[in-house]
Every structure is written in C-alpha cells, then in structure tokens.
C-alpha cells in the first residue's frame, strides 16, 4: 500500500507489546485489528535481528489483510527491507529527511515530539506525516517520559497534521484526550492486558465514532 491509498492516522493506534512468541503476537494483533485499530506499530524491545524481521513480516501480512498500516518503530532499515507502510522516529532515532530518502515519498513517517511544539513544527517542516505528543499521563512503558500538557493538541492544529497522543492512555482518560484535539490515541498497556483484547480495542475505536 502507498501512503496515498492508506487511511489517515486516526482512532486507535495500537503499539505492540514486547512479546517474544511470534505466534501469540500475531494472534493478539489480529484481535486488535478486528476490534477496529486504525494503525499498528511494531515495537518490540526484547527481540532483534532475524526474529524482529520475522515478527514484523508476519504483522505486515496481517495488516495487509485488514488494510491497516503497519508502522515500524525506530528502524528505517527494517521498514525499507519489508516495504512496511512507514516508520515512527523518536528524537534519537534518525533524521526525518534521511528516512524519507530511504523509504520514498509514499511511506508514512511519524515523529515523537514529547511535550515540545517547536519539535513538532520542525518535524512538519521536514516532511513528517503525523506528530505524537506524550506522555499525557504516567506511563508504565516509559515511566521517565516527560509529561505533555494536552493543551498542546489545540496549538498543534496549526501544523495541519494528524496528532497522536501517547502515554498512560486508558478508557477512563481517552475521551478527554480526544476532546482536546487528538486524532489518535496510541495505546500499549491498557490494550494488551485486557482479558478480551478485541473487545477492548473496539471500546477505544468507538470513542471516535
């Protein structure tokens, strides 16, 4: 899929857990996509090399079935090798312009902007397709992440890009984030720890409808 044929980044933006069992990772990711996730980001800090490539490849096949973009976290080389739909970059993960050169004009590039509107403006000027702010709330995934004031979302509207909120987002606080201007909510913990992952994904999805 090309960027132009993909839906915009919006709704539930699911980020994979650190799961080493590829079969289980695919199974739970399928549940999330069936529940209405608008995008899936492959992020696994417990695997690398061939295993990471195999996992991402399996998820890409899955996302193709659901016509949902697969975004690779932090790894432009892996995204290019798999022809994934895009990459998400943090401040230390490489240059947006270099990623665009490596991936081509049709891939999605997202940028972590933490609590910094100036960083978001810079990302937009370099060609990012969406910007992410967070942590919006205390996060078990990144407990030391800087906190982002949700007032940033309204200010970031000037960029004309989809805005993703991340960090400690649950069903209890997501509606306020959306009302503040987030186009998508990136969720890890509140999603994968659910007894019924598909139902939990659907609950998040319904907040946007």
Swiss-Prot record:
Q: What is its EC number?
A: 2.5.1.3
Q: Which GO terms describe its molecular function?
A: magnesium ion binding; thiamine-phosphate diphosphorylase activity
Q: In which pathway does it act?
A: Cofactor biosynthesis; thiamine diphosphate biosynthesis; thiamine phosphate from 4-amino-2-methyl-5-diphosphomethylpyrimidine and 4-methyl-5-(2-phosphoethyl)-thiazole: step 1/1
Q: Name one GO cellular component term.
A: cytoplasm
- ATP-binding keyword on record: no
Sites binding 4-amino-2-methyl-5-(diphosphooxymethyl)pyrimidine sit at: 41-45, 73, 112, 142
Provide the binding site for Mg(2+).
74, 93
Q: Which of this chain's residues are annotated to bind 2-[(2R,5Z)-2-carboxy-4-methylthiazol-5(2H)-ylidene]ethyl phosphate?
A: 139-141, 168
Family of the protein in this entry: Belongs to the thiamine-phosphate synthase family.
- What does this protein do, in the record's words? Condenses 4-methyl-5-(beta-hydroxyethyl)thiazole monophosphate (THZ-P) and 2-methyl-4-amino-5-hydroxymethyl pyrimidine pyrophosphate (HMP-PP) to form thiamine monophosphate (TMP).
> Per its record, how is this protein called by name?
Thiamine-phosphate synthase
